[in-house]
Amino acid sequence: MGDNGDGGEKKELKENVKKGKELGRQAIGEGYINPSLQLARRLISLGVNVTFATTVLAGRRMKNKTHQTATTPGLSFATFSDGFDDETLKPNGDLTHYFSELRRCGSESLTHLITSAANEGRPITFVIYSLLLSWAADIASTYDIPSALFFAQPATVLALYFYYFHGYGDTICSKLQDPSSYIELPGLPLLTSQDMPSFFSPSGPHAFILPPMREQAEFLGRQSQPKVLVNTFDALEADALRAIDKLKMLAIGPLIPSALLGGNDSSDASFCGDLFQVSSEDYIEWLNSKPDSSVVYISVGSICVLSDEQEDELVHALLNSGHTFLWVKRSKENNEGVKQETDEEKLKKLEEQGKMVSWCRQVEVLKHPALGCFLTHCGWNSTIESLVSGLPVVAFPQQIDQATNAKLIEDVWKTGVRVKANTEGIVEREEIRRCLDLVMGSRDGQKEEIERNAKKWKELARQAIGEGGSSDSNLKTFLWEIDLEI
């Protein structure tokens, strides 16, 4: 067949794409959006123009996008469809179908974004994509655009994912049935079934993540030592960062607002993509009225909502302990269409002892001197923010990677204590109180060790991200290696 002209146009487009200094970022969930925005900010400070791409729905929900982030020189925004722009997919919906639609619609949108940018004279020259979006790298490669994965969880978890899909899956699955059995993997601490990511069990409630995760791991395995940017720092996970020879993991974290690192850039605290409306900011005034190190901060993240039974145990633990608390208590109506009520008597007692809010700006809370500890679900953003804040932790993991993060908190970094659930998976009130009393009570050997370690990691984190620190150097080296000027 004769050349119909398409080949020439494609070649010309590839040439257009290769010229320039534009870097595309793709992220979808808030757990990735906030560190991704911080990564964008760091890249911009090094002279790189960034196009930040996320789903239509996430972009619509990014409340702060309209002020600081929208006026940042060097940063532009784009959205792509995941097939559910009208919010028709519920949290308990068919997520296998969602991932399929995300790939189909997202691929079309990214193709349009790349071609439009090239035709407008601002070509994308590198793509950084988030976990489970490996199709973005496939699309980029058709235009000869190189790419790298941004992993917003710890290097230990990335190594676990890679091992699971590259020769160790059967071994891990066989030991998941025995809580007393240890799982030994190169470069990682000894782990038990209680420390494993929740989707590793093929029969578990999060098994729907296995297929897209397998696709991601196999995609990385087919490449020649691909670069992976990881939201951690060298001193925190030295062994895990070197555990997988087939991957070149580069620690570039902690990717958090400068306010937690001792910076004074007020706009940076709002350089995030809040997907939930903040009801008010009177919680800061409330914290101002409390003594130093006297408040327990409680948050289980943007996705998890405690069951009725578990929430009741937490309520009783708080009331019985007497500790003052600030609790980010989201309504169940956000997740299940059923609003949970706390009976009036308990609610009155809770309001006398502490404060409950539907949402807050966590960065502002964590840097407040009134905080004494952080009861957290151990999502990675919250975990690394606790480390940078120097706060002792009560680890209350719920799902996905959180049990692994809790293991690291308690046994590796030793900055907190982890709650132990009963055989039904419920953490009872006595156990919650035991952990709270340990980190908030009178000083003893374990409490003092936790406080010492919290201060140590706080300093090491700030050193890593500072000028000339390991993470600062790693990011500059990355840009030099991909031939983007700094």
Swiss-Prot record:
GO terms, molecular function: quercetin 3-O-glucosyltransferase activity; quercetin 7-O-glucosyltransferase activity
Binding site for UDP-alpha-D-glucose: S302, C360, Q362, W380, N381, S382, E385, D401, Q402
Catalysed reactions listed for this entry: mogrol + UDP-alpha-D-glucose = mogroside IE + UDP + H(+); mogroside I-A1 + UDP-alpha-D-glucose = mogroside IIE + UDP + H(+); mogroside II-A1 + UDP-alpha-D-glucose = mogroside IIIX + UDP + H(+); mogroside II-A + UDP-alpha-D-glucose = mogroside III + UDP + H(+)
Pathway the protein contributes to: Secondary metabolite biosynthesis; terpenoid biosynthesis
Tissues/organs with expression: Highly expressed in young fruits 15 days after anthesis (15-DAA).
Signal peptide residues on this chain, from the entry's feature table: none
EC number in record: 2.4.1.350, 2.4.1.-
Keyword annotations from UniProtKB, A to Z: Transferase
Listed SUPFAM superfamilies: UDP-Glycosyltransferase/glycogen phosphorylase
Lineage top rank: taxon: Eukaryota
Family: Belongs to the UDP-glycosyltransferase family.
Other observations noted: Mogrosides, the major active constituents of S.grosvenorii fruits, are a mixture of cucurbitane-type triterpenoid glycosides that have been proven to be powerful and zero-caloric sweeteners and can hence be used as a sucrose substitute for diabetic and obese patients.
Role this protein plays: UDP-glycosyltransferase involved in the biosynthesis of cucurbitacin and mogroside tetracyclic triterpene natural products (e.g. siamenoside I and mogrosides IV, V and VI). Cucurbitacins have cytotoxic properties and exhibit deterrent taste as a defense barrier against herbivores. Mogrosides are nonsugar highly oxygenated compounds used as high-intensity zero-calorie sweeteners; they also possess pharmacological properties such as regulating immunity, lowering blood sugar and lipid levels, protecting the liver, and acting as antioxidants and antitumor agents.
Protein name in UniProt: Mogroside I-E synthase
